[in-house]
Amino acid sequence: MAMGPPPEDGTVAVVVRVRPPTPSERDGAAHPVLHVVDQHILVFDPEEPGGPPGAALPPRGPKHRGKDLKFVFDRVFGEGATQEEVFQHTTREVLDGVLNGYNCSVFAYGATGAGKTYTMLGSEQSPGIMYLTMAELYRRIEARRDEKSCEVLVSYQEVYNEQIHDLLEPKGPLAIREDPEKGVVVQGLSFHQPKSAEQLLEMLANGNKNRTQHPTDANATSSRSHAVFQIYVKQQDRVVGLSQDLQVAKMSLIDLAGSERASVTNTKGERLREGANINRSLLALINVINALADAKSKKTHIPYRDSKLTRLLKDSIGGNCRTIMIAAVSPSSLAYEDTYNTLKYANRAKEIKLSLKSNVLSLDCHISKYATICEQLKTEVADLQAKLRAYEDAARDAGKQIPALLPPPRMEEAVPESCSAPNVCRESDGEQQELGAGQDAQLGGEEEVLEEMPPSSPSPTQQTDLQLGMKKPNRLPQRLSRSHTEMLMATILSVAQKQYSLLKAANLLTPDMVSEFEELQLLVQKEAAVSPQPTDTSGAPPALRTQRGCDASPSTLSAEPSVPTTRAALRRLQQLTALSSPKLVAKKRRRSEMSNTSRLETPHSLNTRAKRQRKSSPLSAGGEVEAQRSPHTPCLKEPQSPPLLPCCTPKICPLTVTKRRAPLMTSAAQNCCTPTVCDLNVTYSLSEDVAKPGALSLPRFPGWENAPCALKKQEGPFVPRASIPVFSMKGSSIPKPSSISKGSVQKRRGAVSNASRSLGGIQSHITSSSSRRSAQPQSIPEHPPPGLTWKGRSGPR
């Protein structure tokens, strides 16, 4: 079934080519009768001839049609136009239509000796339109070979004395038939399928040798027949399916024989009969052109059957075919009549209307071919999977070539303090934030805000690693100076780590890349475990060497000649020696206080602490264990943890910086502050007389009503009192006066006295965990502390 876009309207494109004058025309002093004004306008028989000045003009005969006639065409080529220029503006433009399923035809029309055969065939030095068109067609087919499969069939025939002959396989005259589906068909015509443009051009050259030519007085190489070279292009999508679209287009390149006058050519006998048949077929072609161009005429009959030539070109002129007519004319006044007639019919052909439609056929496959189609699809899928697998293997092998080229021994010496993975870098960031958590809680409940830091400024993690790397300044330079290869290894590994961090930050990591980086990490850790530890020339035991390294002063470290240090490094080293020990001791003290008050923690605080412990890094845990083992040691020993990045190696981790800002509103729950003393005393005052169990009532507790008012006051900041905590309770949980017994009052008084003994622990616990709780100013916990629980009946919890 024919499918495709709606028909497109158009007209026949007409171009005119003026050939250069021949030597005989120059010697005869014949003035030109054509003047090319520009690329579209041509003047016939101008008033001022373009001949040499002073040349005698031949007298005008009585048959001269007019003077100074102007013709407008789609393109006008002067005497100096080349074959390539004519091709660019004629058949090159219609090749796109052929590849899109449109029929196209290009034919040269004109008198004998006007240059039709030269324009279509050319010579070896200057090939014509047929040669250039075939070369360009195969070039475009090769460009779209991956998308569509193309098949090219060619045929070459001639019409000689109203008989059709095969030029590629010469044989007798062939009959012409009309098929309702295929159109005009020449019975017995051979079709050939060239594999390349060179093979096709060879076929074209052999066909021209079989073409009938004979010299006449008008033309030494006069063609005595009409040659028709047809190219069939069949295209199909490479994707196999149950229904496929098939595009079939036909392109006809026609070299017509020239009309001739018997009085001019002086032909007799066989040549005279040939000329008569040529003129008869051209007359039939002119009638067809007139009928197609006369749109106002009521005649619907087109005289295609008047000649074998017109029957053969029935589907190549007008209708569903993009047609280009090349009118070849002579500028000499000797061919005045022939030039005028050619221009007149060429101007007439411009009025032929076209209705272009793409020849797309939808082929539905029979059910018997479904199995074959499925096999083809499976084969195509297997081929694509094999190509994809080969591509992935090549990419994986290329990634493995980098560690394979590096020498495996002494891997840990090349990167003694580099992070084994980006997770270690992030864990060091968590340790740095946890060490400063105790100091942050004392700044008035400031809020921590994390935002990205530009790569140019160093992050706190980088500064910490830089200070830790300066503890052993004489280790890395000595090892890197041993071999240039080890330095190259360290550089490559740092670049790989940087690439991993950047890709992960941009969310561009693929599973293959992650596996490659993990293999590289495992290789580094494996080599670090296998490689022997470097020997120390001092001869001291390891503990003593560690003690000496910790007790060394910055001046002692900078005095060693083998360590290249800078002023910034010395300043950071001084900061390290001044600030590293207090942070660790404060952390140990804080953790010991938290362990003492573990019995007073609520379930919510236990969950918060469990989450905080899970966030802590292995490095910090290792440091705490070492500190607990040797609490009286003046300097902490080096923890057995993965090595950190040295100061000379670029550290690539998620760059974040911690900024602080004051909260929008201060509250007692956030700042661990208490209301005034009088409110607190009244709130928790209990009856002194044990013998009066019924004296407890709601009006005896004015602090419950004044607490919200005290929290809303903004005249002055709340003064933290470390001696008395604040406890509040929901109204629904207040026991009724009748439900309180004498024993419950005594137990409550004992619980309050026990709670007052551990107020210091509670206050320290509240201070350390206030920054991590998001409690509202008026929120009341559902579960009271275990030291102040109400016994007896209470409201719903």
UniProtKB/Swiss-Prot annotation:
Residues 11-352 form the Kinesin motor domain. Residues 367-402 form a coiled coil. Residues 731-744 have a biased composition (Low complexity). ATP binds at residues 110-117. Keywords: ATP-binding, Cell cycle, Cell division, Coiled coil, Cytoplasm, Cytoskeleton, Microtubule, Mitosis, Motor protein, Nucleotide-binding, Nucleus. One of its GO terms (cellular component) is kinesin complex. CDD domains: KISc_KIP3_like (cd01370). Residues 412-476, 528-564, 579-640, 730-797 are annotated as: Disordered. Its main location: nucleus. It comes from the Eukaryota. It is found in: Nucleus; Cytoplasm; Cytoplasm, Cytoskeleton. SMART domains: KISc. One of its GO terms (molecular function) is microtubule binding. Pfam families: Kinesin. One of its GO terms (biological process) is cell division. Residues 594-608 have a biased composition (Polar residues). InterPro entries: Kinesin-like_fam (IPR027640), Kinesin_motor_CS (IPR019821), Kinesin_motor_dom (IPR001752), Kinesin_motor_dom_sf (IPR036961), P-loop_NTPase (IPR027417). May play an important role in microtubule plus-end depolymerizing activity in mitotic cells. Belongs to the TRAFAC class myosin-kinesin ATPase superfamily. Kinesin family. This is Kinesin-like protein KIF18B. It comes from Gallus gallus (Chicken). The gene is KIF18B.
